[in-house]
Amino acid sequence: MKQHAYEVTLKHIADDQGNPSTYTDTLSFNSYNHDDIFKVLQVIQNSQMLDDEAAKSFAVGLKLFSEVMLEHKHLPLFKDFMPHFGQFMKALKQTVKTQSQS
């Protein structure tokens, strides 16, 4: 299957108390997805169901998680979760469609 390729970089900037991070390294890895994550983000942003920062976190997190789950759907953890995730995705698509039409 052809997939979009991404480089994901994560940098810790502050702890849960607002103090500057003590981590000096960034986490960087390559990830692949059957969807164009930027297009997914655009759809979520256009729906205005979340503020811009939340939309970015949600779109990226959702697509990274879902691709790993699909690639490892034979594992019991993911196999048991797949029907629930399918329901969630249907609800999300309906919500985005409804919000975009408003």
What are these regions (language model features)?
Residues 1-52, 76, 80-102:
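N-terminal intrinsically disordered, cationic/polar leader segments
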